[in-house]
Amino acid sequence: MDNATRHKVQRVRKRANYDRTAIYNILDASWLAHVSFASDGQPFVIPMLYVRDGDDLLLHGSIASRLLKSLGEGIEACVCVTIVDALVLARSHFHHSANYRSVVAFGNATPVTDLLEKSAALSGFVDAMLPGRAAEARPANRKELAATSLLRFRIVDASAKVRSGDPIDEPSDHSLPHWAGLLPLKQGYEKPISAADLNPEINTPVSVHAPS
């Protein structure tokens, strides 16, 4: 498959979307990606935190990782992000499925070495995980920044694929006495748990209170 068609959806093409706004909306709704690439002929898939910066994804990891060093050499890589919105429960086993939003992006990653850019990106990561949290915690110091690998992945080609709606049962199954429909899923927050060594005089901050 050549680079011009590598991102084209092959199965159920009506669910594909190549509009960058639609793609970026999905990317902005998550912060965990699976990054795949090959190093010395061996394929790898690494789960990584990310935050979008324009047409780039900033990927966060440890400077000690040999795999991240390989990825930072500019080799071809593929990033996948998936959000499951509902279980699709059909009248037949065959038509059970899931409603989802997904993005597959192709490109190359290069290391970010500027400490100021690294520091700003780490703040972005923290706020992507929990909006407002960056202002409530200490920024990374020079030693921590030096120990952090930050990769800038340029999105060259990308596609979104979205399934929504009811199960698609066979018409002959509509009269069966089996329930069919959707079981929506939602990622949420539970009650915060303070660290065991936290000063008891420190109250739960606004960013942690807000979503719980």
Which residues does each predicted region cover?
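An N-terminal domain-cap segment
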Residues: 3-58, 69
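Residues immediately flanking
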Residues: 48, 83, 155-157
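A structural signal for short, well-ordered beta-strand segments
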Residues: 50, 107-109, 151, 155
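General beta-strand recognition
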Residues: 56-58, 78, 161
